[in-house]
Amino acid sequence: MLFRSAVAEMVGGNRLLRIDSHGILTHVAGDGVVGDAGDGGPALAARFNGPHNLAVLPDGDVLLGDTWNGRVRRYHAGPGTVSTLPGFNAPPPAARTNGPYCITLTPDGRELVIADLRRVQVLTLSTGRLRVVAGNGKKGTPADGAAAVDAPLADPRAAAYDRRGNLYILERNGHALRVVGPDGRIRTVVNAAGAKGATGDGGPALAATLNGPKHLGIDRDDSVLIADAENHLVRRYSPSTGLITRVAGTGKKGAAGVGGPPEQCELNRPHGVTVHRDGTLYITDSYNHRVLRIVP
């Protein structure tokens, strides 16, 4: 997934890469071998295990969700070293379920939102305090209006806060987008039925269907971009209207159409969507092994 000037090569690559403003790609962390080593030493000698997501700190350091090691690692850009972020640990084999599949910073940059496949937690970076904000650890469909911390979730794959204090949670096997309001109550906003499908673009989001969505991003207007992976689409949920629309992809798996309208560009199981502060949308077109950019 690409954010600002960093790219993480996910799962199979076990590396962290960086693209600078001139388009030059540099390998900055990870030796490409599966493992759990390297804290305190050179980042290029460090080993990761299936990293799925990253977040860039205000100081330029990069947090990496080292998913199957069950930890969050920190790449220190200045000295070029790696360390483990204190406060979160899911020891193997629990890391396959409870590892950090998605990490996002809160809008103020002070806390880290961590989604595993059972719950969503928030880590205060200054203190290392970790608290659960959604999910009771059981798999199921949450009831609208339930307290989020007491509700089950169906494989929450990604989570992020908007600027109004709403927490959006994307469920991979629930095929749905939920929101937890500032009052701590959860409700469904996309796919009320929870059915697997690819319907509803241009209409009410509650009547739409998704298929194995993998990631989300919050746009500058607080709309939610969804990497609808198994539909080979990127879609947008607009809270102000309650509608869902197609942003990119034809719905057909493929690689054609780069350089043309985003809706005519084929995708192949996109696993990441990130909005730069200038409004540029980056799409991790995972099974085409490429990163795409949509300029506003």
What are these regions (language model features)?
Residues 1-2:
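Short, small-residue-biased leader/transition segments that mark boundaries at the very start
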Residues 5-7, 61-63, 111-113, 166-169, ...:
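Conserved beta-propeller blade signature
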Residues 10-11, 67-68, 117, 125, ...:
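Short loop/turn segments immediately following the C-termini of beta-strands
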Residues 22-50, 79-101, 127-155, 185-212, ...:
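Gly/Pro-rich loop segments of beta-rich domains
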Residues 56-59, 105-108, 161-164, 218-221, ...:
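Residue-level detector of Asp-centered blade-edge/turn motifs that repeat once per structural unit
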